[in-house]
């Protein structure tokens, strides 16, 4: 009898469990994995004046070129030498363009002929962040060359890493008055979990034949600007390689490499003359460089090493076919080899010690018979 009661009780419990399972309205759904990919901005704290303008700010403010973006940064004095495709230099608080350094993806740009950097050569469509530092910055992990300038304008290009390994292509076309056309193309692909490739190119063409009124005594004529065509373009090839992973998934060693080429063949309109508008002056500027930057971190995050190397070549050719014997024609060439190493030690939280050493070699020559063809070697150190 006791066994029968136990059997009946077990049957009732089993029946209740089955009824409860049938009446359960809670469903289980498996959510797909979500990946969030974004650029992490460093929290910048500095005892010296610091200005930052990122891609979001540029889109919100509606800036269209590098000059317009630099005008939005307090402390910058932008000098525009005029003309379509003309030279634009930056100075900060009266220091002068020669004392204001401009870095491109962490490596300082150089110009051993005039000493002033033309910022109009760099496309705003490729720029991710503009950062202006006046005086000594709290970031001491920099090259000795960057530490030697009174103010530094850092240009950082777009370096986001796609979450997938599919090709990403973006295009843009700008059209304006007086024959202005500027197409832009950018290609990004993550070839593996550690290697990313990016290529971009842009081309700008403009006739610049804008109209104006010419007053000559009691006569007023409608004229157009002549010999003002601009034909320029530049391309970049960027590579990013992450080597070694830490426990948190971050890369311990990283390598960035860049190949850059710029070409600007433009006509120079000259001054306005009465009774004639014939002029034939031309200026052809070219610039090519290759740079690499390797950064490593120790396992205990106490030591950091950064090594940079760069080869730069530039030429500027002026010609005027209307001058007899072409005696005013001249071509200038400049070359630079540059390398830098920086080692930082962080013995404790809030303490850091950095030593940086740079070596550079510059040469300049031209077609002028009186050219001295100077060469220069330099070593810079900072602690």
What are these regions (language model features)?
Residues 157, 173-179, 203-207, 261-265, ...:
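Transmembrane beta-strands of outer-membrane beta-barrel pores
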Residues 67, 71-108:
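Extracytoplasmic beta-strand/coil segments of soluble accessory domains associated
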Residues 100, 126, 163-169, 174, ...:
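Outer-envelope beta-barrel architecture signal
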Residues 206-212, 217-239, 244-305, 311-335, ...:
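Flexible loop and strand-edge segments within Gram-negative outer membrane beta-barrel domains
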Residues 183-189, 237-245, 290-296, 339-347, ...:
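Residues on the lipid-exposed face of transmembrane beta-strands in outer-membrane beta-barrel proteins
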Residues 23-59, 67, 97, 134:
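Short, acidic, small-residue-rich periplasmic hinge/interaction motif at the N-terminus
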């Amino acid at each position: 009898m006791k066994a029968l009661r136990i059997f009946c009780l077990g049957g009732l419990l089993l029946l209740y469990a089955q009824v409860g399972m049938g009446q359960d309205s809670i469903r289980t759904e498996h959510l797909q994995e979500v990946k969030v990919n974004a650029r992490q901005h460093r929290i910048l704290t500095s005892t010296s004046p610091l200005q930052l303008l990122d891609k979001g700010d540029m889109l919100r403010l509606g800036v269209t070129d590098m000059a317009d973006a630099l005008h939005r940064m307090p402390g910058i004095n932008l000098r525009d030498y005029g003309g379509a495709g003309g030279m634009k230099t930056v100075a900060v608080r009266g220091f002068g363009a020669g004392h204001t350094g401009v870095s491109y993806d962490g490596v300082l740009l150089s110009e051993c002929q005039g000493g002033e950097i033309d910022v109009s050569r760099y496309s705003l469509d490729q720029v991710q962040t503009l950062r202006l530092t006046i005086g000594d910055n709290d970031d001491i992990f920099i090259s000795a060359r960057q530490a030697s300038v009174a103010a530094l304008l850092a240009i950082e290009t777009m370096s986001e890493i796609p979450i997938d390994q599919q090709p990403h292509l973006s295009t843009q076309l700008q059209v304006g008055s007086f024959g202005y056309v500027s197409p832009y193309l950018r290609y990004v692909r993550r070839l593996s979990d550690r290697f990313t490739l990016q290529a971009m190119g842009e081309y700008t063409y403009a006739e610049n034949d804008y109209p104006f009124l010419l007053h000559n005594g009691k006569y007023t004529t409608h004229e157009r600007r002549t010999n003002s065509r601009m034909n320029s373009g530049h391309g970049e090839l960027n590579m990013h390689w992450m080597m070694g992973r830490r426990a948190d998934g971050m890369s311990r060693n990283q390598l960035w490499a860049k190949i850059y080429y710029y070409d600007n063949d433009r006509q120079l309109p000259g001054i306005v003359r009465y009774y004639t508008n014939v002029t034939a002056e031309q200026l052809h500027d070219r610039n090519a460089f290759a740079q690499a930057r390797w950064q490593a971190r120790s396992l205990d995050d106490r030591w950091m090493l950064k090594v940079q190397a760069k080869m730069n070549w530039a030429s500027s050719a002026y010609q005027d076919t209307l001058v007899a014997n072409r005696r005013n024609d001249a071509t200038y060439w400049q070359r630079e080899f540059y390398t830098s190493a920086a080692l930082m030690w962080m013995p404790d939280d809030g303490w850091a010690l950095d030593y940086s050493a740079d070596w550079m070699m510059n040469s300049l020559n031209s077609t002028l018979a009186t050219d001295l063809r100077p060469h220069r070697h330099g070593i810079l150190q900072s602690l």
